[in-house]
Amino acid sequence: MDKHTPLLPGDSVFSRCKTEDSRIKGYDPVISPALIQSELAASDETLAFVSDQRRQAADIIAGRDDRLLLIVGPCSLHDPVAAKEYAIRLQKEAIKHKKDLHIIMRAYLEKPRTTVGWKGLINDPDLDGSYNINKGIRVARRIFLELLETGVGIASEMLDTISPQYLADLICWGAIGARTTESQLHRELASGLSFPIGFKNATDGNIGIAIDAMNSSANPHHFLSVTKQGVVAIVTTTGNPDTHIILRGGKSGTNFDADSVAGAKAKLEECNKLPSIMIDCSHGNSSKNHKNQPKVAACIAEQVANGQKAITGVMIESHLNEGKQAIPEDDLSSMKYGVSVTDACIGWDDTTAVFEQLAAAVRSRRSH
């Protein structure tokens, strides 16, 4: 009998022949969603609050509520202390404008990158390239719970089919980004999420793929993911009716103006979709200059005040202090407090001024 090399535990004939994992450095175990949700459990009061925030967002998207849905906050969260201070301030504004605006805090934990860069708090919570994802998951859930305790709802972006198992019970509204709206995997994921989802137009400005994504995610799907116990499973969904498009501009130019909104409205109606449009004041619409966001918001406010009912939401990248900063390679203590480490944001004073403008626009729209 020919001699052969015995297989190591967890090895296979294929890996011995180097036909798999040839570019994999290693595998690290990850904590299960069930354990994290038990360790950092949400109270009944918190879950009831999340459900109510979702309902209000869905009602606005569907036209049953004439307020504007505002998704406002940092491009990404990197400092739990600053995030909580922002949430406390935002909650006061949410109460102040509750008759005209439904304000949810943008609390993004993962960042899609066009090339490379810091991928977010879950991926690298220590901002030092150590990629302690198990710590990142815990930090992320703890932050979400603390933000919700301030009395403000939270919004986040969906980047994969696994991380929502750890956090989705706390999210009030979700986004599928411009780079992933066309992805079948993300459309399948959206079809099973328990909260409203906004699909951004493509980076080239194409809104057709966002409408296609709405159609796809409204239907049932089957896809691979993991259970709360961390077991790989086939997920069967029922479809998500609470979806809408987000105009964020693109390489072809901005799309927040009245003509672009009218065109998007017509396209949605042509595809038998409810003309419900959120406009992103940042990204392509701001030409990647945060100082342009209030100008974009002013244009949106003018359209709303003039009676445009298709505009149901606005997204703003905002932080305690304006601008952005790079993550230092060595001394993290040198970082500025309340300043974004990803996209540049407008500061707090500009943010509250935009709230006033949009709230006034909603009141004017009611007279049409």
Swiss-Prot record:
Catalytic activity from the UniProt record: D-erythrose 4-phosphate + phosphoenolpyruvate + H2O = 7-phospho-2-dehydro-3-deoxy-D-arabino-heptonate + phosphate
Membrane recorded as keyword: no
Function: Stereospecific condensation of phosphoenolpyruvate (PEP) and D-erythrose-4-phosphate (E4P) giving rise to 3-deoxy-D-arabino-heptulosonate-7-phosphate (DAHP).
Family: Belongs to the class-I DAHP synthase family.
Name listed for the protein in its UniProt record: Putative phospho-2-dehydro-3-deoxyheptonate aldolase
EC number from the UniProt entry: 2.5.1.54
Gene Ontology BP annotations: amino acid biosynthetic process; aromatic amino acid family biosynthetic process; chorismate biosynthetic process
Keywords: Amino-acid biosynthesis, Aromatic amino acid biosynthesis, Transferase
GO molecular function, one term: 3-deoxy-7-phosphoheptulonate synthase activity
Known pathway: Metabolic intermediate biosynthesis; chorismate biosynthesis; chorismate from D-erythrose 4-phosphate and phosphoenolpyruvate: step 1/7
Record InterPro entries: Aldolase_TIM, DAHP1/KDSA, DAHP_synth_1
